[in-house]
A protein has these predicted regions:
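His-Asp-centered acyl/peptidyl-transfer active-site segments
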Residues: 15, 23-26, 43-52, 66-176, ...
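Short amphipathic alpha-helical segments
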Residues: 51-60
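Generic structural detector for well-ordered beta-strands
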Residues: 29-31, 101-103, 192
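Extended, hydrophobic beta-loop-alpha segments that form or line the acyl/peptidyl-thioester binding
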Residues: 71-78, 110-112, 181-245
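Short amphipathic alpha-helices and their capping loops
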Residues: 1-28, 35
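Active-site catalytic microenvironments for nucleophilic, acid-base chemistry
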Residues: 61-66, 101, 227-230
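Aromatic/hydrophobic pocket-lining residues that form π-stacking "cages" and hydrophobic walls in ligand
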Residues: 40
Length: 246
């Protein structure tokens, strides 16, 4: 962002340039064990939270930690994918994503922060048929940001579909799914979280190699897990304390 402020001559600019030249994307997957996954699922069930919102809290807390405690964090959350039969072979599909912006102080306890994100998401879902492209245009007009800039660098998709075969005749056939990058993307970091056959979860990080390395994804996953499991173990602990202890 500091580089973008210098480039555009605006010391108060709240947006960074989107990489438009070197668009190569790499993928790094991490597998979360079934027992640990079940702990997250149980926490969500017991506190009436969605897994998406818990994951958003983990990402935003990490971003806050590495940005000097920044309280104002926005993450783009994909809320639906729509595809037609023709799109199966066209190389694309229609996706709908919305920015989830929350301002959470370090004094806020973990559970309250999760509910704050959930309340924000519930308000967003009411407008899930709104064109994301129009949102981008409106943000640019409202905040007077230059073209091809963005405040968001992280994107999330959670796929709540357990990988199980209901047909007992096919139950012994093992299944395996893996995400592959198409080689180019304008999104800095795109995380897809899905369930695995053994009851665990797969965290698939797609990242632009122009500015990010595999080690960056390793750190993101490591601290996300530290934050989430610290939070569900001690939901009354403040976000600030969690950031200090992890």
């Amino acid at each position: 962002m500091e580089e973008a402020r210098k480039r555009h001559g605006n010391p108060k600019l709240r947006a960074s340039d989107i990489e438009m030249n070197e668009l190569f994307v790499a993928v790094k997957d991490y597998h979360l064990e079934p027992y640990a996954t079940q702990n997250l699922m149980d926490f969500c069930m017991n506190h009436q939270l969605s897994m998406t919102n818990l994951l958003l809290l983990g990402i935003r807390t990490y971003l806050s930690k590495v940005n000097n405690g920044q309280e104002d964090i926005t993450i783009q959350n994909f809320i639906s994918r729509r595809s037609t039969h023709d799109e199966w072979t066209s190389g694309g599909s229609r996706t709908i994503m919305f920015p989830c912006r929350t301002v959470i102080s370090p004094e806020t306890d973990f559970l309250s922060a999760a509910y704050e994100i959930q309340n924000m998401q519930n308000r967003i879902y009411m407008h899930s048929n709104y064109d994301p492209a129009l949102i981008v245009d409106e943000m640019r007009k409202r905040y007077h940001t230059p073209e091809h800039t963005s405040y968001e660098s992280c994107y999330l998709t959670y796929q709540p579909m357990p990988v199980k075969v209901e047909n007992e005749m096919l139950g012994t056939i093992r299944q395996h799914a893996k995400w592959f990058a198409n080689g180019a993307a304008t999104k800095k970091m795109y995380l897809t979280v899905s369930h695995t056959e053994d009851g665990g979860m797969n965290f698939s990080y797609h990242y632009q190699t122009a500015h990010l390395e595999e080690h960056d994804m390793e750190l993101l996953y490591y601290y996300m897990m530290r934050i989430l499991f610290k939070g569900i173990a001690e939901p009354d602990m403040s976000i600030g304390e969690i950031m200090e202890q992890v």
